[in-house]
């Protein structure tokens, strides 16, 4: 089995080296955070509904992009739906870099509420692992 190397283009705010955003403290990953935020029953709990859980996650205006490597993860808080990944040996066509103003507003509101500073911008990064 080989090593995967991916290029990632995403619109968001880089968290910086050795930085996991404060709102992520106590959670295993961003999906775990979203599941807690949703208030829906979690996997294994009575009433858990995967379809509702997935719908909540996909409708949330923010996503987290991990880059660098699995051994040394770095994060970008991103506007959901802006991430494009090109794996080694493949090219992806970028047809538009426009980001919907409503999505940007919802993203900025989330960042303000969670103490994430900076302005979103297009970031090109890589993932090795």
Give names to the regions the model predicted:
Residues 1-109, 113-118, 128-129:
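Acidic (Asp/Glu-rich) sequence patches and key acidic residues
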